[in-house]
Amino acid sequence: MFLRSVNRAVTRSILTTPKPAVVKSSWRVFTVANSKRCFTPAAIMRNQETQRVGDILQSELKIEKETLPESTSLDSFNDFLNKYKFSLVETPGKNEAEIVRRTESGETVHVFFDVAQIANLPYNNAMDENTEQNEDGINEDDFDALSDNFANVNVVISKESASEPAVSFELLMNLQEGSFYVDSATPYPSVDAALNQSAEAEITRELVYHGPPFSNLDEELQESLEAYLESRGVNEELASFISAYSEFKENNEYISWLEKMKKFFH
């Protein structure tokens, strides 16, 4: 399902006065003695704070592991992956997720999305109910809340030969609607130009012309591109998968983050 529009030193100086050698020596002894008396409590305080952070991290880690649904595993996503012949590209330690499929016509479809962004999208159940009851769809009071529910999804489709052109579609996915809005369609001279993740390649992609706003295109062209994407598996089921997998991966990444933090503070 596709949507057509989105309203978018201290500077300090210290003066010292020369003092007799005997007095200076006495002052140093006094200072060292005091510093020794203060050091131990300060060290204890630091150790206590370190231990406190470690204990909290351990507690949070325990809670997260205990509340993990037993049925949640990568296997739970196999129905969708097998149906559309998508393969999951595992990216441990990264926000970005990727799934890939090869079509019967020899095209390769890459779908990229940010699991942290999607897992933290607000979801307003009340607004969802209001939308269902409103025959005209979303009213003005709900529009601002709805616009906060969009996440970026990038779909890159390439031909069989690596030297052939590729097209990158920048999409906005709405969690509540299970729908996609095409923001732009950008052609590239090769797969490498579209997918290379080097800093130089990313800068080049930022500078390239991305075409006019999708909504400014001829309506028939819009419809045909949307139908093309749907035929490649960009549909409500993909939106549901992206939402569910993002929750799964983001939670696993959070547990991994807690474990790494705990190692430092313990």
UniProtKB/Swiss-Prot annotation:
GO terms for biological process: aerobic respiration; cytosolic ribosome assembly; mitochondrial ribosome assembly. Belongs to the MAM33 family. Keywords: Mitochondrion, Phosphoprotein, Transit peptide. One of its GO terms (molecular function) is mitochondrial ribosome binding. Its main location: mitochondrion. InterPro entries: MAM33, MAM33_sf. Homotrimer or homotetramer. This is Mitochondrial acidic protein MAM33. The modification Phosphothreonine is found at residue 91. The keyword Mitochondrion applies. The keyword Phosphoprotein applies. It is found in: Mitochondrion matrix. It comes from Saccharomyces cerevisiae (strain ATCC 204508 / S288c). Residues 1-47 form a transit peptide. GO terms for cellular component: mitochondrial matrix; mitochondrion. Present with 4910 molecules/cell in log phase SD medium. PANTHER family: COMPLEMENT COMPONENT 1 (PTHR10826), COMPLEMENT COMPONENT 1 Q SUBCOMPONENT-BINDING PROTEIN, MITOCHONDRIAL (PTHR10826:SF1).
